[in-house]
């Protein structure tokens, strides 16, 4: 099993403000790892709101959820849902009905250990927005964190707050071992709007947060289309967004990829004359 820590597989979480594309990113990132042959699980930590299974297209298959496993009302094997698109990807849904207090540190740790012992190479923890219990639980056991943010001041401020919590409350911070490895993922990025001064540039965001950039996801309607179809956008062939997520997975796995979708290409004279955008 691959991992940053000596204790088997890595645990990944993603965080940020509501609506920044965390769950979309979790679904596509986990799917991208599975497409690369990695046995991967993705866990929804948003108790009460549950939407990862909708984006993954498996909402009708949910019988048991993470809280059932924590309360020993079901086994992990019973609760895990096999993904429709990737044989080596499994989803652990959140509970729609339970109280957030049912999410205990001991219970989450037991699930993660069982997953590691079952041969999962990567465990992606999809964190809810803000700093509520589910978010803190998702980051507690992280080996690496992908901070998902929009290029807007309020979103970047929220991400800065989350970085503070990771650096103070993660198990790695508490035990004084090597800190959680942090990555910055900027979503809904429009170089044209950056050029017009309507949006922070990726350099601005990096300057504020001071963590390494793992990738940029361009603003695109294909994300909404994919969500409505219950298909992670990484599966949409030939779309910029799909290519961007594949680049992120490659960088995460240690491969070099040029940074795409970051610069505004002004339309040429002919396209302006003939009405191109």
Predicted regions and their residues:
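Hydrophobic positions on the alpha1 helix immediately C-terminal to the Walker A/P-loop
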Residues: 25
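Post-Walker A helix-loop "phosphate-sensing" segment adjacent to the P-loop in P-loop NTPases
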Residues: 32-41
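P-loop/Walker-type NTP enzyme "switch/lid" segment
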Residues: 15, 45-117, 227-231
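Conserved catalytic-core segment of NTP-binding enzymes
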Residues: 110, 117-118, 128-214
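Single conserved hydrophobic/aromatic residue that forms the stacking wall/gate
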Residues: 1-8, 12
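Walker A (P-loop) phosphate-binding loop of P-loop NTPases
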Residues: 18-19
């Amino acid at each position: 099993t691959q991992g940053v820590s000596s204790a088997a597989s890595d645990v990944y979480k993603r965080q940020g403000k509501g609506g920044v594309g965390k769950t979309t990113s979790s679904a596509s990132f986990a799917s991208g790892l599975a497409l690369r042959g990695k046995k991967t699980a993705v866990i929804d930590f948003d108790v009460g709101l549950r939407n990862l299974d909708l984006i993954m297209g498996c909402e009708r298959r949910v019988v048991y959820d993470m809280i059932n496993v924590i309360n020993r009302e079901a086994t992990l094997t019973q609760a895990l849902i096999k993904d429709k698109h990737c044989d080596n990807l499994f989803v652990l849904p959140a509970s729609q009905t339970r109280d957030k207090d049912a999410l205990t540190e001991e219970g989450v740790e037991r699930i993660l250990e069982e997953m590691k012992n079952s041969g999962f190479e990567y465990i992606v923890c999809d964190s809810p927005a803000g700093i509520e219990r589910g978010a803190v639980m998702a980051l507690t056991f992280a080996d690496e964190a992908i901070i998902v943010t929009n290029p807007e001041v309020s979103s970047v401020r929220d991400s800065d707050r989350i970085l503070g919590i990771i650096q103070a409350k993660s198990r790695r911070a508490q035990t004084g071992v090597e800190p959680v490895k942090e990555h910055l993922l900027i979503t809904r990025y429009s170089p044209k709007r950056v050029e017009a001064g309507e949006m922070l540039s990726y350099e601005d965001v990096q300057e504020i947060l001071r963590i390494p950039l793992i990738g940029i996801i361009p603003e695109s309607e294909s994300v909404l289309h994919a969500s409505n179809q219950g298909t992670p956008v990484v599966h949409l062939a030939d779309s910029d967004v799909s290519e961007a997520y594949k680049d992120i997975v490659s960088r995460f796995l240690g491969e070099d990829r040029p940074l795409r979708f970051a610069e505004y290409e002004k339309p040429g004279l002919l396209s302006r004359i003939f009405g191109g955008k």
